[in-house]
């Protein structure tokens, strides 16, 4: 779910688009991913943009999708942050 790199932390998520609001809804134990509802449709990158905006606001850091651009399962790189900081912000 979390891997520290020289650039920051890789966070594995599973996305549910077209939700009422964008929020973290739990942990998918089987997949080892954070479950995130996204209040945007999966059309023309809208859900991806909303997802990155949400995590940028949460962590106060740049966020990029490093894997899963067109999939519900994504790996996000949160730049310039430690694994400990991510755990604290996610309240894991």
From Swiss-Prot:
InterPro entries reported in the protein's UniProt record: DUF167, YggU-like_sf
Name the record gives this protein: UPF0235 protein PF1765
Gene3D superfamilies: YggU-like (3.30.1200.10)
GO cellular component: cytoplasm
Family: Belongs to the UPF0235 family.
């Amino acid at each position: 779910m979390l891997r520290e790199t020289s650039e920051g932390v890789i966070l594995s998520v599973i996305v549910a688009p077209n939700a009422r609001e964008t929020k973290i809804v739990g942990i998918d134990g089987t997949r080892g991913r954070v479950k995130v509802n996204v209040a945007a449709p999966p059309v023309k990158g809208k859900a991806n943009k909303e997802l990155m905006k949400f995590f940028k606001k949460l962590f106060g850091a740049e966020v990029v999708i490093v894997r899963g651009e067109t999939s519900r399962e994504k790996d996000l790189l949160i730049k310039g942050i430690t694994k400990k900081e991510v755990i604290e912000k996610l309240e894991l």
